[in-house]
Amino acid sequence: MTFFLFAKQLVDMLYQYQILDYIMVVLVFLLLIYQTALVRPNFRKRFMLTDGIIILLGLLLTVTFIRSGNGYQIYFKVMSAFLLYFVGRVYYDRIKECYGGLTLAAYFVIYINFFTRLCHFGFAFLKVQNAGGDLYYYDTDMAFAMILAMVFITMFGRNTVFKLVTVFVICPCMVFSSDAGIQMVLMIAVYAIMAIYFMELMSNQQRLAGIFLVMIISGLLGIIAVIYMPALGFDNSEFVISLFQGGFFNNDNMYSRYVDWKAVLDNCREQGLIARLFGSGMGADVIIQSLYIKIFYSLGYVGLGLSLMLIISIMYYVTRVEDRKTFYLAVIMAVLLLGSGVTVNSIESTQMSWFPLLFSGMVVSSVQVEKEKNRRGGRICLRL
């Protein structure tokens, strides 16, 4: 597991070598089989509602894949993300022992890309508006990797001057000197969430921290709602884009997204009832730069409903996890996956989906084990 967590961030950076992704999936299968055979969990006792929702989404996607007859790469990527959820379920305790590997890989990813950009642009790299993705395909992928690495270093790295420089100087320079608009918004949100976490640690004001956290998440949901208004026909795209004034989102890219989104939604409306309920296809030949619209296109209203149930179910367990670091880490992962999904089909990116689903599974198992320990403790007290 330590090797997997260390290698995953580096494999994402080496995206052009697709064979590495397949090797990682094989490794995940082997890890899952090994740990299941070693622990031999009671599946009937351990089965949770969240597990059932994941399985139903996988079955629904399989039916869509069989119906469409194409999109095997999409199917492979999404199913591998679901697989990572179950890896998190069985490795929940082992993952916490491997945070050092996550941190080391995070430093490698940040500074390899930083020196690559420095060699490419020189000391003018701060004026760069489009970095070309550095060692990633797009700036969005690069910025997501920087934020993810920054989170791992902040949460698990040793407190040093080097860590502070990395988190507060290098990472923001890499993200804000790029064309990754949505990731800039998410980076600000992640900084705010981490600030709330440290405020809670110092003041022990969990309720106040919860209020601030709700305010941030509500603000993000409001931004998402405003962005999608033109696609749903509630307002014109010129008005929404003018709100951002090109500060975070590239105007030309947003206009093209609105055109694509409306075309996809119009196509879905023209389909029959079965297609609207269960999806129109895998969308291998359609450009859909949105997680939410892609779910509707591929899985229909049923898939949207199941996805909403999955989010609610996972967040239910997140709010009940006792370890506050795990709680904030899970919240940040959810913000990154769902926030990136506004302008990127993040569930089909193994870089964006694997870690959030892995930690989701870990949280569900952690809460389940904590409940069992509390029950045993209660029984012992009654006997005494």
Model-derived features: positions:
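Flexible juxtamembrane loops connecting transmembrane helices in multi-pass membrane enzymes
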Residues: 208-211, 223-262, 274-275, 282
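Hydrophobic transmembrane helix bundles of membrane-integrated enzymes that assemble
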Residues: 1-238, 287-375, 381
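Charged/polar, solvent-exposed surface patches and flexible loops
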Residues: 242, 263-266, 270, 316-320
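Long extracytoplasmic/lumenal interhelical loops at the membrane interface
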Residues: 247-302, 350
